[in-house]
Each structure stands twice: as structure tokens, then as C-alpha cells.
Amino acid sequence: MLVLTRKLKEAIQIGDDIEITVLAIQGDQVKLGINAPKHVEIHRKEIYLAIQAENNAASHASKSSLKRLNEQLKHLKGGKQA
């Protein structure tokens, strides 16, 4: 992990197109401004983890839903042939 020290209004450059600037420091909170292309997703860590958990849960639900749908289609197909 790279550790950098920045003062108020100083910035960090990541690659050619991402810049992180220290906008304010109030007690134990630091306000950051991030300039990045629109295609770059930026989230607070706790939000990112919640999104990952939700996506993981949705993928499992989708697999079980597809399995049930497949069983229903087999049942319908079997019913039409009879």
C-alpha cells in the first residue's frame, strides 16, 4: 500500500485521468474531491461492499429462479405433448 501525506487543497494524481484533492479537514473527517471519467465508478468502501453483496445475492437468486423456470417450461412442454 502506498501511503501519501497531503495538506488542504493538495492533490494526488492517479494515471492520466484521475485526480483526488483534499477539500476540507474537520476534526477526524477529511473531505475529498475526485475528478475522474464518467465510466469510472467511485463509491465509499461500505457502499461498494453493499453493492457487491447485493449483486452476489441477486446472482444466486437468479440461478434458482432460472432453475424453477426451466422446470416449469419442461412441465409445460411435457403437458402439451400429452
From Swiss-Prot:
Name the family.
Belongs to the CsrA/RsmA family.
Query: What species is given as this protein's source?
Result: Geobacillus thermodenitrificans (strain NG80-2)
Task: Report the protein name in the record.
Answer: Translational regulator CsrA
Q: Which GO terms describe its biological process?
A: bacterial-type flagellum organization; mRNA catabolic process; negative regulation of translational initiation; regulation of bacterial-type flagellum assembly; regulation of carbohydrate metabolic process
Write down the InterPro entries for this protein, in alphabetical order: CsrA, CsrA_sf
UniProt keyword RNA-binding present: yes
Q: What is written about domains in the entry's comments?
A: Interacts with FliW via its C-terminal alpha helices (approximately 44-57 and 63-74).
Q: Name one GO cellular component term.
A: cytosol
> Where is the secretion signal located?
none
Q: Which SUPFAM superfamilies match?
A: CsrA-like
Q: Alphabetically list the UniProt keywords.
A: Bacterial flagellum biogenesis, Cytoplasm, Repressor, RNA-binding, Translation regulation
Query: Which cellular compartments is it found in?
Result: Cytoplasm
Q: Which GO terms describe its molecular function?
A: mRNA 5'-UTR binding
Assembly mode:
Homodimer; the beta-strands of each monomer intercalate to form a hydrophobic core while the alpha-helices form wings that extend away from the core. Each of the alpha-helical wings interacts with an FliW monomer, yielding a FliW-CsrA(2)-FliW complex.
Q: What does this protein do?
A: A translational regulator that binds mRNA to regulate translation initiation and/or mRNA stability. Usually binds in the 5'-UTR at or near the Shine-Dalgarno sequence preventing ribosome-binding, thus repressing translation. Its main target seems to be the major flagellin gene, while its function is anatagonized by FliW.
One Pfam family matching this protein: CsrA
Superkingdom of origin: Bacteria
